[in-house]
């Protein structure tokens, strides 16, 4: 069972147990509180398959965070529009009634102007000190051993991502391997306070058996076994540690946002692991207010596409199963469906496919033909991330609530 099954159970949990709540968008939600999802990265890259996901948008937003960027122009230029509504709402609130010299702009016109007018984009495309600013340039009161001088602003800032990488390389057993986006002193300057507000990484040493397996020597015995072990032990290119990532999220738009968040933090884990030569091990999400917007409920049901047990029963082919069906006790929907699950009878018209893989290209050649390694801090481009063997069901459209 991988994280997609956890996700589908979460949708079902909200539909069955969610309480109605009002929210800042005025849409209304059904909500549960305090859930956790987990995924072992060796089961595949956790990009949902029960609906088609926008891979390029996931990569683009994460690189936007890692650049320390807070202006949507980078996103818009790369056809990623998940923050359009927040920027447009900010524009509407902060412009006068006539929108100054711009006239009345529809959201589509606003986004086109962001794309084509650099001066306009600089003024109205910025979302305030959101994720990227906090990850890469958290303002501190003065100079300390963690801070650097930001020449653009003149402030002393802390580059949390750079510090995290340095700590992973020098003190991987630290319990302070954290990055935080919840800067209380700057929340009122943000167009939208962070929903996923922080993450922590954890590392452990790999066993000799795990390193042998990574090197392709699993199960090797005989005369040369000790020599192979010594070779693997001395080979520093074979990772010596596994790394896991856990993120915390206060507000979870379960239908649209959470699938993005899962894939984004999984990709971040892959990038960091590659940077510090560790093996991505486990991804964990701690989720607070876990909700479905009321205008996403039908879409969630479509994604689940649960098949009633009476239809599932007709898929039985083994004569002994057909005979024993009537002896299920207690004869309740829950027990019947569990019995059918054990016999691998499809429970949904959108059964999950095997998860894909992600390949990261961190090698490059400079203008002088000299090879170099790209860094999580500044080097990656959208084209450096290749999604392999991704098979999915059709997309399910739903409105973005701002």
Segment roles from a protein language model:
Residues 1-402:
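Terminal, non-catalytic protein-protein interaction segments that mediate quaternary/complex assembly
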């Amino acid at each position: 069972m991988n994280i997609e099954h956890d996700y589908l159970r979460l949708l079902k949990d909200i539909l069955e147990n969610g309480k109605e709540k009002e929210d800042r968008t005025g849409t209304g939600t059904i909500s549960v509180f305090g859930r956790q999802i987990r995924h072992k990265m060796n089961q595949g890259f956790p990009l949902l398959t029960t609906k088609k996901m926008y891979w390029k948008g996931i990569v683009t937003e994460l690189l936007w965070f890692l650049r320390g960027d807070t202006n949507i122009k980078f996103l818009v230029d790369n056809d990623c529009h998940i923050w359009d509504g927040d920027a447009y709402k900010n524009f509407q609130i902060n412009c006068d009634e006539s929108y100054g010299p711009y006239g009345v702009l529809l959201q589509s016109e606003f986004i086109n102007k962001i794309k084509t007018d650099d001066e306009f984009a600089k003024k109205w495309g910025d979302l305030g000190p959101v994720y990227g600013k906090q990850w890469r340039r958290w303002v501190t009161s003065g100079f300390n051993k963690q801070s650097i001088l930001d020449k653009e602003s003149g402030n002393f800032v802390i580059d949390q991502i750079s510090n995290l990488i340095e700590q992973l390389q020098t003190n991987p057993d630290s319990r302070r391997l954290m990055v935080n986006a919840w800067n209380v002193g700057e929340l009122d300057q943000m167009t939208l306070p962070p929903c996923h507000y922080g993450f922590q990484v954890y590392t452990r040493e790999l066993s000799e058996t795990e390193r042998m397996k990574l090197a392709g020597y699993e199960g090797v015995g005989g005369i040369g076994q000790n020599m192979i072990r010594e070779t693997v032990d001395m080979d520093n290119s074979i990772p010596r540690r596994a790394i896991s990532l856990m993120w915390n999220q206060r507000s979870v738009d379960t239908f649209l946002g959470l699938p993005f968040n899962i894939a984004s933090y999984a990709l971040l884990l892959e990038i960091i692991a590659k940077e510090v030569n560790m093996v991505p091990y486990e991804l964990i999400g701690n989720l607070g207010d876990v909700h479905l917007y009321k205008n996403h409920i039908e879409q969630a049901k479509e994604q689940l596409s649960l098949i009633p047990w009476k239809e599932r029963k007709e898929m039985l082919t083994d004569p002994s199963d057909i005979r024993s069906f009537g002896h299920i006790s207690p004869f309740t929907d829950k027990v019947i469906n569990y019995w059918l699950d054990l016999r691998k009878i499809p429970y949904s018209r959108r059964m999950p496919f095997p998860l894909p893989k992600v390949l990261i290209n961190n090698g490059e050649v400079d203008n002088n033909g000299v090879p170099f390694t790209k860094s999580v801090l500044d080097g990656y481009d959208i084209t450096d991330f290749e999604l392999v063997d991704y098979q999915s069901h059709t997309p399910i459209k739903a409105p973005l609530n701002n």
